[in-house]
Amino acid sequence: MTLILGLESSCDETAAALVTGDRRVLAHRVAGQEAEHRPYGGVVPEIAARAHVDRLAPIVEGVLDDAGVTLADVDAIAATAGPGLIGGVMVGLVTGKALAHAANKPLIAVNHLEGHALSPRLADPTLDFPYLLLLVSGGHCQLLLVKGVGDYRRLATTIDDAAGEAFDKTAKLLGLGYPGGPAVERIAAEGDPHAVPLPRPLVGSAEPHFSFAGLKSAVARAAASGTHDVADLAASFQQAVVDCLVDRSRGALAACPDARAFVVAGGVAANGAIRTALTDLAARFDKPFVAPPLWLCTDNGAMIAWAGAERFAAGLTDPLDTAARPRWPLDPAAEAVRGAGVKA
C-alpha cells in the first residue's frame, strides 16, 4: 500500500503526517505558533518562517517514530509548494526536496488549496467527483467545482478579503485575542446575532463573488462607537458572514445541478454556526453535505499527504527544481476578479 509523507508550512502551523493510499493516517503532528504571534495580533511572516526552521525536522522525525517506519518505507514526499507566506513555504518545500533526494523518493509539490479541496475525501471514502466546494480560510474564500485531481473550475472568489481574515480582524477590534476565529465563535455564543445591524456585501446580487471588506469596516465603526455589547457584536458579525456564505453558495448550487455533494473545507469550516447553516442549505438542494472533522479543517500535514497520495496515484510527481509559489490558483484559467487574484 502506498505511503506518503506530507509536509505543511505555508502559514503558522508546522505539520507533518504519514498517510496511506487507503486513507489510513498512520501518524500526524502539528505545532502551532499562537504564543509567538499573539503579541502582534496576527501572523508575522518572518517569525513564522523561523519557527518552521526550528520545528519541521523534529516533527518529521516524530511522525516517522510514531508510525514505526523509516524514510525507506515511504513511497513519496509531498510538500506544500504554495500558495502562502513564501518564507514558510520555502522551508517546507526545501525540506521535502532534501528528504526526497536523500532517500531517492519522488517529490510531489502540493498546492495548499488542493490539500484543503481533497481533504474531505480523506475523511469520507464515499465522496466522489464532481462536487461543489466552498473553500473558506484565512487567506481564501472560493467556490469551486472539483471535477477531479488537479481539475478545478472556480465559480466565485473574494473581491477583497477572505472570511477568515475578517474573523481575525474582528477579534482584534474586539480585543478577543489570537487566533481570531475560535475567539469570535466562543463569545458569539453568548450574544444576539440580530442585535447589531451589519451589511451583507453582495448578498442578493447577480455577481457570484464574495466581499468582506465592507463588513470589516462596519464592525470597526460599531466597535469604535462603544455602544454595543462585545458578545452581541461578535454574534452579529458571525451571522453576517454566515448569511454571505449561504447566499453565494445557494447560487453556486443552483448553477451546478450535477455536483454529487456540497462540501466545505478550510480553517473557517471549523466554525459551528457556518457548518450548521451549510448543512441546512445542502438539504434544501437535496445534496449530501460533507465537512472534514475539525482537525482536518485547519492546516495540517495529513491533507498534504492525502493530496500527495491522490496525485501519486494519478502518476503526478514533480522535479526537484520545482519553485515555491506565493500565489498559485487552483483554476489558472479563471479570470482575475478585481483584487481577488492577489492571494489565490
Swiss-Prot record:
Keywords: Acyltransferase, Cytoplasm, Iron, Metal-binding, Transferase, tRNA processing. The keyword Methyltransferase does not apply. GO terms for molecular function: iron ion binding; N(6)-L-threonylcarbamoyladenine synthase activity. GO terms for biological process: tRNA threonylcarbamoyladenosine modification. It is an enzyme of class 2 (transferase). Required for the formation of a threonylcarbamoyl group on adenosine at position 37 (t(6)A37) in tRNAs that read codons beginning with adenine. Is involved in the transfer of the threonylcarbamoyl moiety of threonylcarbamoyl-AMP (TC-AMP) to the N6 group of A37, together with TsaE and TsaB. TsaD likely plays a direct catalytic role in this reaction. This is tRNA N6-adenosine threonylcarbamoyltransferase. It comes from Sphingopyxis alaskensis (strain DSM 13593 / LMG 18877 / RB2256) (Sphingomonas alaskensis).
